[in-house]
From Swiss-Prot:
Pfam families: NIR_SIR (PF01077), NIR_SIR_ferr (PF03460). This is Sulfite reductase [NADPH] hemoprotein beta-component. PANTHER family: SULFITE REDUCTASE [NADPH] SUBUNIT BETA, SULFITE REDUCTASE [NADPH] SUBUNIT BETA-RELATED. The keyword NADP applies. Component of the sulfite reductase complex that catalyzes the 6-electron reduction of sulfite to sulfide. This is one of several activities required for the biosynthesis of L-cysteine from sulfate. It comes from Salmonella typhi. InterPro entries: CysI, NiRdtase/SiRdtase_haem-b_fer, Nit/Sulf_reduc_fer-like_dom_sf, NO2/SO3_Rdtase_4Fe4S_dom, NO2/SO3_Rdtase_4Fe4S_prot, NO2/SO3_Rdtase_4Fe4S_sf, NO2/SO3_Rdtase_FeS/sirohaem_BS. Its EC number is 1.8.1.2. Belongs to the nitrite and sulfite reductase 4Fe-4S domain family. Gene3D superfamilies: Sulfite Reductase Hemoprotein, domain 1. GO terms for molecular function: 4 iron, 4 sulfur cluster binding; heme binding; metal ion binding; NADP binding; sulfite reductase (ferredoxin) activity; sulfite reductase (NADPH) activity. One of its GO terms (cellular component) is sulfite reductase complex (NADPH). Binds 1 siroheme per subunit. Binds 1 [4Fe-4S] cluster per subunit. Keywords: 4Fe-4S, Amino-acid biosynthesis, Cysteine biosynthesis, Heme, Iron, Iron-sulfur, Metal-binding, NADP, Oxidoreductase.
């Protein structure tokens, strides 16, 4: 594949302005501390607008009222999104109670948003509450370091495996990888936690003074569940077990879904297999992949800076050989592994030690008290009595983990009383959207606010064609950055403009194939008409057990994407 097209190891040329910003930031300090005291604006100015991302925050505004405020000669209502670092999505009930209180008392929207990267976000934090949120997190053993911008982001880990013992081991590795790849700068502690400035020079032995060329995403995945969507990520450790014990990992590198509309130098790409490594080499290999991307990634063009482009430019074998050289190992051949699904198993599942896990479906991950469904209050009440932990899944759901038999009935009653166990269709369980409007500055079309009613319509189409219990993995993302992971869905909608989407078809249920654009810039009625026709054909013509995405490929409705660098846009 990529070996046919070898390119330079380092891209020469004028560095992007982001590289200047990082270099001049004094290891991510900038003038954030001074900016915090500027009461004339609700936002951060100059480089600080981007630098706060390294501290886990994005500056946003409420786009529903942007025009109204402009007419009143007011600046946009600036507020921050904060994303917590939570490897593997595991959070204690004490931590949950603290974040519940902060959301209620100190955010505009009052909600907790579970993300498909197994963490939570607060939306609508005013500038005066920015420092307090970091201090609140620190007080319960959490932080927001490196959850955005050019670093290794929150490390994912399969959250509901069939073998609980394996989860415990894999989760420990997710934590170790996260800690190992964290930035070493003291900027976070100095600015947010008021820790003293130390008169030593900061060093970043792994990330370097200008950090990574672009965001970098890592997973630890336990087959046969691909719930964390490994092909959306730069670096993936696939757990290999013998007799129920973790012995090593298969490494897959170079996945990523973000594109830019009309820019044919960008494409979604699945991750490539590098080989198998025994457990003891895990951190060395993780570091080697990151430092190779640090040194070879494109720092002249951020649209082509991710690992997937580096891999295609230099060639897979060249990149792999460099990782082996830096880690001091030779990869063994890939060990057999198979994925059979990626949805969460909603409801009760029995684990080891006679403990139970209850997976709750949270539509689009938005935890709020809705009329007749006080989800947020319900989870708070469960957190007050539950002796285990919560786990956030990569499908934006929540697991009440390690429930003893004696507590099962009580927790189930709380969940039912607060609308947390209402029956939903298989289709709704397998549908997901990013946040998009009103808070995301990149949003081109609705996603989270659009999906529930759109799912109703897809459910009606399934019913019409006599397959109401079937499901299609469906995802909506408000812009081509792809946070909703539409580029690994059977039906992927990518926002193009208000009320308009590109429709992608031909992904599969296990998330190992990129869907191709079927129709461009179309409205919701157009999408429904296309799906009505195609789902009707699927219902009549499918083979036994054949998913919708596989059917669209077999029936010749869509050509599969086989080599994205070459054929994604064809």
């Amino acid at each position: 594949m990529s070996e046919k097209y070898p390119g330079p190891l380092v891209v020469e040329g004028k560095l992007s302005d982001a590289e200047r910003m990082k270099l001049e930031s004094n290891y991510l300090r900038g003038t954030i501390a001074e900016d915090l005291n500027d009461g004339l604006t609700g936002g951060f100015k100059g480089d600080n607008f981007l630098l706060i991302r390294f501290h886990g925050m994005y500056q946003q505004d409420d786009r529903d009222i942007r025009a109204e405020r402009a007419a009143q000669k007011l600046e946009p209502r600036h507020a921050m999104l904060l994303r917590c670092r939570l490897p593997g999505g595991v959070i204690t009930t004490t931590q949950w109670q603290a974040i519940d209180k902060f959301a209620a008392d100190n955010t505009i929207y009052g909600s907790i948003r579970l993300t498909n990267r197994q963490t939570f976000q607060f939306h609508g934090i005013l500038k005066k509450n920015v420092k307090p949120v970091h201090q609140m997190l620190h007080s319960v053993g959490l932080d927001a370091l490196a959850t955005a911008n050019d670093m290794n982001r929150n490390v994912l880990c399969t959250s509901n495996p069939y073998e609980s013992e394996l989860h415990a081991e894999a989760y420990e590795w997710a934590k170790k990888i996260s800690e190992h790849l964290l930035p070493r700068t003291r900027a976070y502690a100095e600015i947010w936690l008021d820790q003293e400035k130390v008169a030593t020079t900061d060093e970043e032995p792994i990330l370097g003074q200008t950090y990574l060329p672009r965001k970098f995403k890592t997973t630890v995945v336990i087959p046969p569940q691909n719930d964390i969507d490994l092909h959306a990520n730069d670096m993936n450790f696939v757990a290999i077990a013998e007799n129920g014990k973790l012995v090593g990992f298969n490494l897959l590198v170079g996945g990523g879904l973000s594109i830019e509309h009309g820019n044919k130098k960008t494409y979604a790409r699945t991750a490539s297999e590098f080989g198998y490594l025994p457990l003891e080499h895990t951190l060395a290999v993780a570091e080697a992949v990151v430092t190779t991307q640090r040194d070879w990634g494109n720092r002249t063009d951020r649209k082509n800076a991710k690992t997937k482009y580096t891999l295609e430019r230099v060639g897979l074998e060249t990149f792999k050989a460099e990782v082996e050289r830096r880690a001091g190992i030779t990869f063994e051949p890939i060990r057999p592994y198979e994925f059979t699904g990626r949805g969460d198993r909603i409801g009760w599942v029995k684990g080891i030690d006679d403990k139970w896990h209850l997976t709750l479906f949270i539509e689009n991950g938005r935890i709020l008290d809705y009329p007749g469904r006080p989800l947020k209050t319900g989870l708070l009440e469960i957190a007050k009595i539950h002796q285990g932990e919560f786990r956030i899944t990569a499908n934006q759901n929540l697991i009440i983990a390690s429930v003893p038999e004696s507590q099962k009935a009580k927790i189930e009653k709380l969940a039912r009383d607060h609308g947390l166990m209402n029956a939903v269709s298989a289709q709704r369980e397998n549908s997901m959207a990013c946040v998009s409007f009103p808070t995301c500055p990149l949003a081109m079309a609705e996603a989270e606010r659009f999906l529930p009613s759109f799912t109703d319509k897809v459910e009606a189409i399934l019913e019409k064609h006599g397959i109401p219990d079937e499901h299609i993995v469906m995802r909506v993302t408000g812009c081509p950055n792809g946070c909703g992971r539409a580029m690994l869905a059977e039906i992927g909608l990518v926002g193009k403009a208000p009320g308009r989407y590109n429709l992608h078809l031909g992904g599969n249920r296990i998330g190992s194939r990129i869907p191709r654009m079927y129709q461009e810039n179309i409205t919701e009625p157009d999408i429904q008409a296309s799906l009505d026709e195609l789902i009707g054909r699927w219902a009549k013509e499918r083979e036994a057990g054949e998913g919708f995405g596989d059917f669209t490929v077999r029936a010749g409705i869509i050509r599969p994407v086989l080599d994205p660098a070459r054929d994604f846009w064809e």
